[in-house]
Design a protein with these regions (language model features):
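Short boundary/linker motifs that mark transitions into or out of structured domains
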Residues: 121, 126-186, 190, 232, ...
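Short, amphipathic alpha-helical interaction segments positioned at domain boundaries
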Residues: 255-269, 326-342
Length: 342
């Protein structure tokens, strides 16, 4: 039974590295339980670390953190300890906690130095480069500024109305207005915020929200309806006033308005964020990690392939997708942590 459990763990680790994620969570849980039952605490701890890594990869941050808390760090093999701290750093980065992420990266670097394995040191260096890369863009009064993770964290705590285009919501102090399921309202809000303190012309709003090149009366009528819906969502944080040429945001309490946008935007940014780890991914694993349908992933991959951003290896079920070249591609805000509903 012990040898079989170790073989299952090895197979699960290979599956994780090759991004063959189907059924992997159950396989790791089974292997971890069997190894612990046989008293193989080192490999059981290693299986727990792999569980946390998988949960982070698929965006389940609370579960990943809970698994890390159950691990006995002393039981972990020396080669597993840097990765364990990298998982902790990844959780902190996704939650926009720069200090916690930096501390975890420092511990990962110290842990990687002990076994003297060059590949571990390289993995830590790659994670630190991702931490140091721009994590977001501040758009305010017509100006754009790149922010690192600490800058994003400070912005989220500032006393302003922040249109968070990474998580599709409006932040005003402790109040959150989620708009993730309302792309038209989010597009209108962002256009209004980017124009503030001025007004946004109706033509701009129609183009941003409805992609209408030649607006007719039906488009204008729909715009009035959607602006009315947006007013209801923004109260009591802000109002929307009609002007001669469009609409303008009116924040309550004299707060200023800014937009937090991802450092890189465009269609299928989430796919590129995952592929930026340099691994070869199956389309099914990408769908699992992004929590979208396989058909949506296939369409996105085909579009990225036509644009020269990705390429594939293998055929049929063995096909894997890789990014062609995206050095330093920042992923932190492209794969955000879930935001609690108001």
């Amino acid at each position: 039974p012990l040898a079989r459990a170790r073989c299952r763990l090895a197979a699960a680790e290979i599956a994780l590295v090759t991004r063959d994620l189907g059924g992997l969570e159950r396989a790791l849980g089974t292997a971890r339980g069997a190894l612990a039952a046989q008293g193989d605490w080192a490999n059981a701890a290693h299986a727990g670390y792999l569980q946390a890594r998988l949960l982070l990869l698929t965006g389940r941050l609370d579960q990943a953190e809970a698994v890390l808390e159950t691990l006995d760090a002393a039981a972990l093999p020396p080669a597993s300890r840097p990765g364990c701290w990298l998982v902790a750093a990844g959780i902190a980065m996704r939650r926009i906690r720069a200090g916690d992420a930096r501390a975890a990266l420092d511990r990962a670097a110290r842990a990687a130095h002990q076994p003297g394995i060059a590949a571990l040191a390289a993995e830590v260096a790659q994670a630190r480069a991702a931490f140091d890369a721009p994590a977001g863009r501040l758009i305010e009064s017509g100006r754009e500024t790149l922010l690192d993770l600490a800058g994003v964290e400070a912005l989220l705590g500032a006393d302003l109305l922040l249109v968070d285009a990474c998580r599709n919501l409006l932040r005003g102090g402790a109040t959150l207005v989620p708009l993730a399921g309302r792309p038209v309202l989010m597009a209108l809000l962002r256009a209004l915020a980017e124009a503030w303190p001025g007004d946004a012309p109706r033509e701009t709003l129609l183009a941003r929200a409805f992609r209408a090149r030649h607006a007719d009366e039906s488009h204008r009528a729909r715009l009035r309806v959607e602006i009315g819906r947006l007013r209801e969502h923004l109260s009591p944080l802000a109002g929307i006033k009609a002007t001669g040429r469009g609409f303008v945001l009116e924040p309550c309490g004299g707060r200023r308005i800014a937009v937090l946008a991802p450092p890189v935007e465009g269609d299928h940014a989430g796919l590129l964020a995952l592929l930026a780890d340099g691994e070869a991914w199956s389309s099914s694993a990408l769908a699992l990690a992004l929590d979208v349908s396989p058909r949506s992933v296939q369409r996105g991959l085909k579009a990225l392939e036509r644009a020269g951003r990705v390429e594939w290896l293998g055929h049929g079920r063995a096909r894997r997708w890789v990014a062609r070249s995206v050095p330093g591609f920042p992923t932190g805000l492209l794969l955000p942590a879930p935001v609690p509903m108001r």
